[in-house]
Each structure stands twice: as structure tokens, then as C-alpha cells.
Amino acid sequence: MEEIRVNRLPAITWRYLHVNDSPDQFEFPGNSASAVFSDKRYVSEGGTLPTDFCGASAETLAAAEKGQAYTVIIPENTEAELTISITAEEDRPDFAGCFIFKLEKGAKLKLIWRLSGDRKHSVFATASSYELMENAVLSVSYLETGLPASSLYEQRYAVLGNEAKLDFVSAELGGEKVIVHSYGKLAGSRSEIRETALYAAAGSQSLDLFYHIDHIGKESNAVIDVKGALSDTAKKIFRGTLAVSYTHLRAHETLSDL
């Protein structure tokens, strides 16, 4: 286990405020569970993350890259549904892996992630990239349940073409420590990203949530909406950034953290 820094802000502020990043006691994943796909028609093994994929930290990204890699390509004008289930087991309590998604022009995908397990201690480190071509539509639901006393690192990167739409919905209900690092690039005109996260943390659970969306394409739209409840000594850290180029003043953005 080593101390690292995670979820550093893209533009740092005064260090004495202690908001630029977070300290984390990081443990590399050990024996890895398997990722189970509900449909393998569009799935192949292997793949490489984009070179500018940063992740929560260099260490957490390296951990994910040491695991198995999968590539999912949805062909042009194809509609598909896919569920990826990862369950911590007695002899394989951890998980590390990379997932590369590409939606070709006009493709649509409903993607569900399910992370679960009753192991008292697990480390999950995932890194997922999403490339949406023109008019592609992606809906992602992310559900964590169980996994007591576990550390969950969810790292993702998305690039959208013209009029592409991406909707992330996360239910952060499991894990002792949850770290989310999400970067989106609205590269195409009239592209849209919506990030919605719901959480309910109790006991000593902690959440460190990072969202950054760059507006590059004209008339792009972004929403970051985080809501939930804390009880006992549970805590949450939220870092959200919506960056708009001065040449694209018609971009629309909403940021909410409750």
C-alpha cells in the first residue's frame, strides 16, 4: 500500500486550501475476477486506451492497464444492449481491467455496469474510454452494491462527435471508498453529455467524485448533477469543472452538487 494523490483539478488553486487533489492509500489489485458480458457479438479481447487518458492518478490508471483489456465496437446505425457484470469472489476478490468502446455513426448502445460482491475487502480499478461518432447515442448505467470495506476506482474518458449524445447515470451504493474520475470532451457541434450520480453513504464510507467536461464543438450541452445523503461519519468530496472556449459562447452547461 502506498500514499498517492488522486483527482487533481485541471487548474490548481492555492495549496493551503487543500482542494487541488486528495490523498489516498492505494493498494494494487491482486487476483482479478472476471468481467461477464451479456452479449459478446460486439466484444473482442485486447485494445489500448487513448494516449491522453489521465485517470484518477498515474498509479490507478497503471493498475487498470495491468488487467485484461476489451474492445466493444457498435457498427454504424446499429442498436444494441450490453450488461457487464463483475463480482468479487473468495479466491478472486479484486478486479483490474480496461474497456474501449466505439460507437460508429448513428449507433445506439444501452450499457449497464454491475459491480457486486460480499467480500470484506476488494480493490476494483477500471478504466473505460468511450468514442461516439456522429449522431451516436450512448446510455450508461453504473450500479455498485455490497462490496463492504472495498476500494472502487472508476476512471472514464469520453469523446463525442457531431450531435452525439451520452448519458451517464451512477448509483454509488456500495464500497467503503469510491473514487470516480470522469472526463468528457464535447468535440462535435451540438454534442451532449449528462452526468447524474446518486449516492447514499453511511458509517465510514467515503466518496471522491471528479467530473470535467470540455466544450469544444459549437452549441454543445453539458449537465453534471450529483445528489445524495450522508450519515454517521461518511464523507464526500466533489470536484466539477465545465470548461467553455470563448469562441463557443452558445454552449449550455449546468452543474449541481447536493
Where are these regions (language model features)?
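Conserved beta-strand/loop scaffold segments within soluble protein domains that form the structured core
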Residues: F53-S256
